[in-house]
Amino acid sequence: MNPANYLFLSALLFTIGAAGVLLRRNAIVVFMCIELMLNAVNLAFVTFARMHANLDGQVFAFFTMVVAAAEVVVGLAIIMTIFRARRSTSVDDANLLKF
């Protein structure tokens, strides 16, 4: 497959994720869209690394996945806290976590 196709797919996935972040109000859906955007960036890194015969993009994508795993833990903990406090996963309720 042509590397341009992978870059087009990466841009498409990033656009879908950005639209989901901007248009959705459910925190879980927004969180999934952020993860989709991170995976799109990883695909672009790996594609550029393959195009230039360099491993730096693949290593950077690996470290991005490690950071994303830690982000999942923290993000889900915050979403669970919002749900326990407000019985809703709406993004609009996120500013209500103040004591």
Curated annotation (Swiss-Prot):
InterPro entries recorded for this chain? NADH_UbQ_OxRdtase_chain4L/K, NUOK/Mnh_C1-like
Residue stretches spanning the membrane: 3-23, 28-48, 59-79
The protein's job, in short, is: NDH-1 shuttles electrons from NADH, via FMN and iron-sulfur (Fe-S) centers, to quinones in the respiratory chain. The immediate electron acceptor for the enzyme in this species is believed to be a menaquinone. Couples the redox reaction to proton translocation (for every two electrons transferred, four hydrogen ions are translocated across the cytoplasmic membrane), and thus conserves the redox energy in a proton gradient.
Keywords per UniProt:
Cell membrane, Membrane, NAD, Quinone, Translocase, Transmembrane, Transmembrane helix, Transport
Annotated EC: 7.1.1.-
Entries under NCBIfam families matching the protein: PRK05715.1-2 (NF004320), PRK05715.1-3 (NF004321), PRK05715.1-5 (NF004323)
Record-linked Pfam families? Oxidored_q2
- Write down what this protein is called: NADH-quinone oxidoreductase subunit K
Q: Name one GO biological process term.
A: ATP synthesis coupled electron transport
The top EC class is: translocase
Organism whose genome encodes this protein: Nocardia farcinica (strain IFM 10152)
The reply to whether Cell cycle figures as a keyword in the UniProt entry is no
Subunit composition?
A: NDH-1 is composed of 14 different subunits. Subunits NuoA, H, J, K, L, M, N constitute the membrane sector of the complex.
A GO molecular-function annotation: NADH:ubiquinone reductase (non-electrogenic) activity
Q: Where in the cell does this protein reside? A: Cell membrane
The topology of this chain with respect to the membrane is: Multi-pass membrane protein
Chemical reaction(s) catalysed: a quinone + NADH + 5 H(+)(in) = a quinol + NAD(+) + 4 H(+)(out)
A GO CC term attached to the entry? plasma membrane
